């Protein structure tokens, strides 16, 4: 930049009207300061001695004569000055051209000051931006350091240092103080404690499905416990489970383990051990005092009620409308329930009775029924109460209860794939009793509540998805030796919180024989009706 200022001063001195002063110094200086090509230097040398005019008309002929601008004007118009600025600016922005002298390429001896000022301003702006970015990086780096430091000793030292210069206004420590204080307010130990307590509370109140399956197995009452009112009551009731129920569950588990050990001792080594691993330990025998009460009573906790379901197709109409019978799968084979499909019904309608010889609706032994929709993919289980739509009764207890609802969904894998089932049942109270659900109209039933996702006081169960076996070429489930033949009707119903806790299991063992095992909180009537729903044809599913 200093060289350019000197050249500009010399050029302006040559253009001014002083002839005597300009001729003597310019003649020796121009050949030294202009190491231009030979052709351009010749033009300059011929012009200088011929007419040393003060106006400088001859020096402007090669470059400025074409544009027609007089060089005497000290302040050219901005419009005229901007035209050569674009060409000169391009030259200045070229990194290689900056190293050269502009006088080597341009014959014009005068360089515009406006372009130099713009270039300097651009460089200054770039420098300022770089400095600003460096300052920002320097400012942002210090607060990151306290976040990385986790040791308590360093935090204590920093506290002491931070408390000292509080009165100094010019100290650079105050800006990072809030970050350090925030980290100190919530130390790692206290945060983990709070989170642990929250997780414990949520596990006790809401019973998250991520909980351990062992705890779900030990307390099936808590898994199926619901409140009759708001969810807050439900959480309180789940927290306050009686200790007596827990003791009973522990005693039942101990009894089951004792039975397992006694059975294994009596068996010989070798094959007996393999069978013991495959099959479940037999549950203690279930006593049936009164059939009506037993059929409606939930299964005892910690026990599996094993039953056998048989189908009778004999007779003229038995092929289309067979009868079904349920017995306990024991040596005595105690009869529990019987069911048949009604003939003059628009939809699938099964009557369930506790008398195998009298399957009429008007009999005293009528205990419940199973009814489906037109498509045959949704079923509802009722007891023997009164229908609220046919005859209104002032006594609410006489109205029928909805004991269960079964929904069959179309499988994604095609018609030959496994079925998808959803079972809705009433929840259980703290006294291990079923919550009564007596809808007074069709818009308050289990299916409508399930569609509207208002599942208060209800429990939603699903079938356990089977696994494809390449060796057998079919979908398989582990029935623990209770099912021997493949069938679309084979299924296992489980709870989402504990997939290993099988609430209901149904499968084929012969052409007209099936096994039916159910556990708490189901009763025999619910299990039998759910199994009957699998026999009916489903237009939307298969």
Curated annotation (Swiss-Prot):
It is a peripheral membrane protein. It is found in: Cytoplasm; Cell membrane; Secreted; Synapse. This is Tubby-related protein 1. Belongs to the TUB family. PROSITE patterns: TUB_1 (PS01200), TUB_2 (PS01201). Residues 1-289 are annotated as: Disordered. Changing residue 489 to R: In RP14; abolishes RPE phagocytosis. It comes from Homo sapiens. InterPro entries: Tubby-like_C, Tubby_C, Tubby_C_CS.
